[in-house]
Amino acid sequence: MNQWEELQESVGFDFKNVELLKQAFTHSSYVNEHRRENVKDNERLEFLGDAVLELTVSDYLFNKYPDMAEGHMTKMRAAIVCEPSLVEFAEAVHFSKYVRLGKGEEKAGGRTRPALLADVFESFIGALYLDNGIDKVVTFLERVIFPKIDAGAYLQTVDYKTQLQEIVQRDRDVLIEYDILGETGPAHNKAFDAQVIVNGQVLGKGSGRTKKQAEQSAAQFAINKLIHR
């Protein structure tokens, strides 16, 4: 059994077009180093998967919470499809082991980079939608995401920076600092990377479309790390 057969068995779906599945797990760095192979990266599938994920999650929230206000549903959806949550979902189904990376990106730790894993999860959703249709996407989410919604994991949408501050300052005074590490992407579609440092120790890193979102993402990762110590 090769890795793609293993992956299909793991997710519970057979792909009619296995090349589409491979593309979902192909980072641009791999394409750059294998130009003779005529492979495609996963960026277009990520674009599609992002929209499919928003639609399916929105539909689920709309039907599950018939009395919930639009504003609250919007916040809930944002918490479900944000980068830290997508990374959690990707890790739950062991997607990182199947990602095709260039040698440089691999050495730089790309396989565990949060933004990369979140992108792979979205690109897989895009590929699954194209190959199997929306119903199979819903079936997959019923296994990976919807149970967490049912358990109430996203009912309390929070300010993660405030929550982190409350957690670490319960017993003592501590110094919490946020650093913007850099930015990537064109001017119209920038992504910022941030880290949160508590008493000199890096507790979390994250990224977002704005500096504030990146800091919130870093704080959420730090909270998850503290909770699962």
Swiss-Prot record:
Q: What class of enzyme is it?
A: hydrolase
The cofactor required is: Mg(2+)
Q: Which UniProt keywords apply?
A: Cytoplasm, Endonuclease, Hydrolase, Magnesium, Metal-binding, mRNA processing, Nuclease, RNA-binding, rRNA processing, rRNA-binding, tRNA processing
Q: Which residues form the active site?
A: D50, E122
Under the cellular component aspect of Gene Ontology, which terms does the record hold? cytosol
- RNase III domain location: 4-133
Q: Which GO terms describe its molecular function?
A: double-stranded RNA binding; metal ion binding; ribonuclease III activity; rRNA binding
> Known EC number(s)?
3.1.26.3
Q: Where does Mg(2+) bind?
A: E46, D119, E122
Question: SMART domains in the record, alphabetically?
Answer: DSRM, RIBOc
Compartment annotation:
Cytoplasm
Q: Could you tell me which Gene3D superfamilies the record lists for this protein? A: 3.30.160.20, Ribonuclease III domain
Query: What does the subunit section of this Swiss-Prot or TrEMBL entry state?
Result: Homodimer.
The record's section on PANTHER family has:
RIBONUCLEASE 3, RIBONUCLEASE III
This molecule's function is given as: Digests double-stranded RNA. Involved in the processing of primary rRNA transcript to yield the immediate precursors to the large and small rRNAs (23S and 16S). Processes some mRNAs, and tRNAs when they are encoded in the rRNA operon. Processes pre-crRNA and tracrRNA of type II CRISPR loci if present in the organism.
Family under the similarity heading: Belongs to the ribonuclease III family.
Q: What's this protein's name?
A: Ribonuclease 3
Q: Name the source organism.
A: Listeria monocytogenes serovar 1/2a (strain ATCC BAA-679 / EGD-e)
**Recorded name of the encoding gene:** rnc
